[in-house]
């Protein structure tokens, strides 16, 4: 996008690869917006999912997973204003540059209003089902300011309570009871991204910090 101000709604950007910047989107001097958009498995030299070079861009109710770059930036703001809100940012490379993030779930945490770090609880991310399980902490976690009327599938978002984070709205107003799990850590383990409740003593994580990034209230660790 160069010198243009498009509006993107209900779109999926998947498996794009660029030798330059912006695996899915490169925005140059653009005043554009992305709502209910999914960015999955995109890669670039810089900004695996998104690269901004001047302008003012917003990402609202977006889901970003497994976007990577050679410089370890999943999103990169080289210059301009970039805002991310009501979104899920999980398993990506880092957010680089000055990015205003609010009401969002960012793996590892990120400074900003009402941001948090917690396993998203996708139905089946490995098979591209990014809808939310009933216990997902994404449910009812969004901002009540200027609520988007529907999600990527056209499902109505809650208008009397807080909407869900990400591109997909669950039918529940609040998450159901969560069943805690036990995570395993060992020197022989591997730090891989987990989206739901997949735990196994035979496939432990390698570090405590990685494990804690995946934990929800009530979970435990065995080292």
Write out the residue ranges for each language-model feature.
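Proline-centered structural pivot motif
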Residues: 6, 32, 57, 143, ...
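Flexible, charged surface loops at secondary-structure boundaries
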Residues: 1, 177-179, 213-217
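C-terminal accessory segments
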Residues: 114-169
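Right-handed parallel beta-helix/beta-solenoid
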Residues: 119-128, 171-210
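Acidic Gly/Asp/Thr-rich repetitive segments characteristic of extracellular carbohydrate-active
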Residues: 153, 158, 164, 188-223
